[in-house]
Amino acid sequence: MNXQQIDMLVKQLN
């Protein structure tokens, strides 16, 4: 996972 993927997941979870 890269930073962009993590950022997208965090946005979906919040």
UniProtKB/Swiss-Prot annotation:
Q: What class of enzyme is it?
A: oxidoreductase
- Cofactor list: Fe(3+)
Ranked from the top, the taxonomy reads: Bacteria, Pseudomonadati, Pseudomonadota, Gammaproteobacteria, Moraxellales
- How and how many cofactors are bound, per the record note? Binds 1 Fe(3+) ion per subunit.
Example of a GO biological process term: beta-ketoadipate pathway
Pathway membership, UniProt: Aromatic compound metabolism; beta-ketoadipate pathway; 5-oxo-4,5-dihydro-2-furylacetate from catechol: step 1/3
Name the record gives this protein: Catechol 1,2-dioxygenase
- Gene Ontology terms for molecular function: catechol 1,2-dioxygenase activity
UniProt key word Iron: yes
- Originating species: Acinetobacter calcoaceticus
What does the record give as EC number? 1.13.11.1
Stated family: Belongs to the intradiol ring-cleavage dioxygenase family.
